[in-house]
Design a protein with these regions (language model features):
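N-terminal catalytic or cofactor-binding beta/alpha core of small enzyme domains
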Residues: 1-151, 155-185
């Protein structure tokens, strides 16, 4: 399952933060090609689903995951173009993972566009983050995936949206295959 909680402007501690529109686009594109479930924040309610103590967005995500037996949630975010890393994967030092298949599948993919960091800067460890809250409440693997904006926005020469989409598509397909191989009756 894919999550894009910052698809619209959001308010964190009284400060309006810009929308991460490309994460919504990415989630929609992956839904179209893979038919995987998505949740995308489409209306600004002066809130931040990845920060506020109470969040209807997180509640809806947890409810969906529980009712539909989702195995993994990728929580998509955009990283500032000023950062060096191409990706930062937040797992709360592995606490948000229920298996080791998910992280190894993600980290195995070499995009050839920049560094992939794990649990540096954005660990997704705060109790009100989408990843930590969903992992705990729904007992599911959940990874916060921070993608550098310079690879998602056409304004940058490093633009590589199609490669990122294709890599995530390949990763999701691989995870589905791995989980199917590990189902026991």
């Amino acid at each position: 399952m894919l999550s894009a909680p910052h698809g619209v402007e959001h308010t964190r501690a009284g400060r309006v933060k810009p929308a991460e529109v490309q994460t919504s686009d990415l989630a929609r594109d992956l839904h179209r090609s893979l038919h995987c479930p998505v949740i995308i924040k489409t209306k600004s309610n002066d809130d931040d689903p990845n920060y506020d103590e109470h969040s209807p967005y997180r509640d809806a995500l947890v409810d969906y995951v529980k009712k539909n037996d989702a195995r993994v949630v990728f929580d998509l975010h955009q990283l500032s173009s000023e950062r060096e890393a191409a990706f930062i994967l937040g797992t709360a030092d592995g606490k948000n993972l229920r298996d080791d298949i998910t992280l190894s599948t993600l980290c195995r993919k070499d995009l050839g566009i920049g560094a992939v960091l794990v649990d540096e800067v954005f660990k997704a460890s705060g109790p009100n983050t989408v990843a930590a809250s969903t992992a705990k409440r729904a007992d599911v693997s959940c990874i916060q995936i921070e993608i550098n904006s310079k690879y998602l926005c056409k304004d940058f020469p490093e633009y590589a949206y199609d490669r990122i989409r294709d890599a995530l598509e390949e990763c999701i397909t691989s995870l589905n295959s791995n989980f199917a191989d590990h189902v026991y009756d």
